[in-house]
Design a protein with these regions (language model features):
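Active-site cores that bind ATP or allylic diphosphates and position pyrophosphate for catalysis
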Residues: 1-266
Length: 266
């Protein structure tokens, strides 16, 4: 619809999903990397993201405690878990992935438990209904079931119905936490998070000819954006800082504000 509305020359192409189902929670046996290193041949060995997250949180197959939650000590994945993960993730990505696991620098949805509880306790049906993706029916259900809501994931299970899907409720709860009431009609800026050195000339040309401001330093944003753009950027920075704060609480490392983070240059 967006392409038609913009009269775009882009031709969309659908790609058939390979491997396990979208919400499959088990990791398949076998080596996906060796079976299909370029992801082009048909195989049943591709795990879903849900299954990979489940393996990280429950390395014993659902019988052990979730590793490295916000209130639990950081615990590295065992060798068996690491080997299974390495068979499901491309080598270069697995290196970064395992580094984060070993240092405990990752969050699960239940890292938001305390924040979610606080946010829901101060709301009523009318105020909840003002958040993006929160219908009046969902707002009433949240208030009626509030005494039963414990963790983030458990809250989703309690609140979901045939009409209110798991994904919809997850989005709604995140919007409540992040204080998001409406979606912007358009994004009035582009923010660069990183680039390759050899692409610096291209970046310069984009900056010169783009119809919207290209942000490389947050300190410059206020003068480049209008009030709507600054508001959207402020919400983005808040979300990033919240994630960073939760990581710091979990790992004990020093907090780094989003405005202090350097561009990634490869």
């Amino acid at each position: 619809k967006a392409l038609l509305r913009l009269n775009s020359r882009i031709r969309p192409v659908t790609l058939r999903r390979e491997g396990m189902g979208y919400h499959e929670t088990t990791v398949p046996e076998g080596d996906s990397a060796s079976s299909s290193p370029d992801l082009q041949s048909s195989t049943d060995f591709f795990a879903s993201a849900t299954a990979i997250r489940s393996l990280i949180q429950n390395p014993g197959g659902g019988h052990s405690e979730a590793i490295s939650d916000i209130n639990n000590p950081v615990r590295n994945p065992d060798t068996k878990t690491a080997n299974i993960l390495s068979s499901q993730i491309p080598p270069d990505a697995f290196y970064v992935f395992k580094k984060a696991l070993d240092s405990g620098e990752f969050l699960t949805e239940n890292s938001l438990d305390s924040i979610l509880s606080y946010c829901l306790m101060k709301e009523n049906v009318e105020s909840l209904s003002s958040y993006m993706d929160v219908s009046e029916d969902l707002a009433r259900r949240i208030i009626n079931q509030q005494n039963l809501l414990l963790s983030f994931s458990q809250s989703v299970s309690v609140l979901k119905t045939r009409e209110l899907t798991q994904t919809r409720i997850q989005r709604a709860l995140l919007h409540i936490i992040l204080n998001i009431h409406t979606a912007p009609t358009q994004i009035p800026f582009a923010r660069v998070l990183g680039f390759r050195k050899e692409s610096s000339e291209l970046l310069s040309r984009i900056k010169q000819h783009s119809r919207i401001p290209l942000i490389t330093k947050l300190a410059d944003a206020q003068n480049l954006l209008d009030s709507e753009g600054n508001q959207i950027l402020s919400e983005t920075v808040f979300s990033s800082n919240l994630y960073e704060k939760l990581l710091c609480l979990k790992t004990g490392r020093k907090f780094c504000h989003e405005s202090q983070k350097q561009l990634i240059i490869l």
